Amino acid sequence: MFAPSGVVVIGASRQSGKLGAAMARSLAAFPGSRALVNARRPEPAEGVYASVTEAAAHTDGRLDLAILCVPAAGCADALAEAAAAGCRAALVCAGGFGEAGPEGEQYADALRQVADRTGIRLLGPNTSGFFAPQRGLTASFVPAAAHLPAGDIAVVAASGGVNHALAFDLADAGNGISLGVGIGAGLDVTAADVLEHLIADAGTAAVALHLETVPDGPRLVAAVRRLVAAKPVVALVVGRSDVGDFARSHTGALATSWRTARAALRQAGAVVVDDERELVDAITALSRVRLPAHADPGLGIVTAQAGPGLLLADRSAADGIRMPELTEATQDALGGLLPPLTYQRNPVDTGRPGETFARVLGVTAADPAVDLLAVYALTEPDSVDVASAAQDAGLGADSPAVVVVGGPHEDVAEQRARLHKAGIPALTGPTSAANAVRALVTDARQRARVAVARVATDPGTTGVPGSPLDEDGAKTFLGTLGIRTPERVACDTREEAHRAFERLAVGGQSVAVKVLDAAILHKTEIGGVRLGIRTPAELDAALDAIDAIDGTGSTAPGGRRYLVEAMAPTGVDLVLGARHDPVFGPVVLAGLGGTAAEALADVAIRLAPLSPAEAAAMPDELAARALLDGWRGGPVLDRAEFGRVAAALADALAASPPDVAEIEINPLRLTADGLIALDAVIVHTGAATVHGTGAGIEHTGAGIEHTGAITAPAGAVTAPAGAVTAPAGAVTAPAGEEPGQETDKETDHAQA
């Protein structure tokens, strides 16, 4: 496919404007054998033949790659002809397949059948092609791609258009391309196939990955993990807009395909970026410099202009990158090289750079606390030559650095070319430098994580029982996993509820009363949760309200049942869930409890199974992690306890019957005494559940819908909310609610 001896274009044309003509022009510089086929208008005298067999007979060398520039209806026959003539790979450019309805699906099926029968590998359909500048091969209907410089960065993109756009952007940033592939519909060759190919490709130093759909999540993750062990991968995932899709629980609503794909790629070791500009900056750096694995690399900054240096320092600090103060010995050495009024602790402000600039760079880079150096300087007249200074300082692979050069375009381009030739990444602004620094540090941190293969599920873990569980049953199951829950009593009658109240409401302790029914998923939305019950009269009023609920489809054999439960202490509420993702398999999600989690999108996701140690790091990814570390005198999360609970939940899902789609604890409250599960939901596919007033019965597991990005679960009606209670001044329960117990009412999280 990517290193053919010869290429044949089927559907070639001499008419300008035709796809086949553009492809023929793109291949003009290919050094191997070339042949053109046009069954309708053959011109043997002009080198255009009626069939691949005829073309092969008149061509020196083997034709390995067939490029199909024919309509969808003719692709299967053309592919079969190419395979019969000895071609081993094919590029199908046409659209009009699966995306075009039933007729297009038939064309796609016909292509698959030919590929399966003959063994020919197929890239596409619906792609603008690929290019391999190192081999002089441009199999693209964008002839300008033939002018891309050869280099060591590979691009693997879902879209042929994005493949070209990224390659041109990378070239504009002073980079060269080893391979650029647009996957298109991915009927046969997928991104995972290309990534596996690149593992052993000596001409590729780093890989840029763009994803829209993932046909096989576990295979993609395995390919990225293997590739990252050899060379860095920078990934951009499309599909942020699907975060608003509804699902049956917070876990489903939060573990969207976009979030899950990004989390899976991070867990595999890729550096995940937010946009194409950041991708270009990241890969520009990582293709030249890769820090040793390090849990927390230190950044040193040397700037010849204070303002831009401060921009870089400010952004790096916001990214959580450590900027250590330089040692006393380093500062003493800098003091002998710089004017007395300059700042010399880190960042180092040199003032207008002079003849000592190279020595300043070398001294700062040699500081034992500095693992990476970032440099900023303008190309001022009669000032320092930045590229020469960087090389004189020994910056490069042995002394990792990124250099930002500002100034007129021509001057910057000249400096950048020299720096890149020396193996030093050159950027053109503080933001680009910060992107590069973050990528280098992220890559080092991820490789420093304990290299544990995906752990096996604990064989001793008990799975969820086959039948649907109500809240009491779900909490009892959590108890078998060692997860603490409030003291409670399940009651079949009002009399039992009163006896439970007398037992639990000791010393003025208030209780919660809830409807108990496995068919009701979101109890508060139908008035099925009553909090802060302190007297028998209040209990009767609560029971009356629950008895008045209509249309809930109660599954209780004797009618309405109740759960009477002790109120929990105040604390900070989390959501923790394990679910089956349709693309990546089992995943675990953690975030703030309640609707705030969905609104803020502040979640951490991991593929499961996972070790308690890996799960323990999840809360540290949350933007609101300060709430878990004793905010204003509040409770402190024991990471080890959290890791044990999360890993246990993942193991429980794996040990459960296939129809158990999800296990969720929301809220999982952090209190002074540790974690306690205040509510639990176990979702079975095909089980009937109630979703709020007037919602009727909705069936879970109704199917999978495509959001235009990674596949995501079909949306249910609503997701459970939940108040977040925290220490005074942080997150508080809504007015009129009893602090310290779950509620599905929306909470104001402005102070959080």
Positions of PLM-derived features:
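Short, cationic low-complexity segments
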Residues: 737-738, 742-752
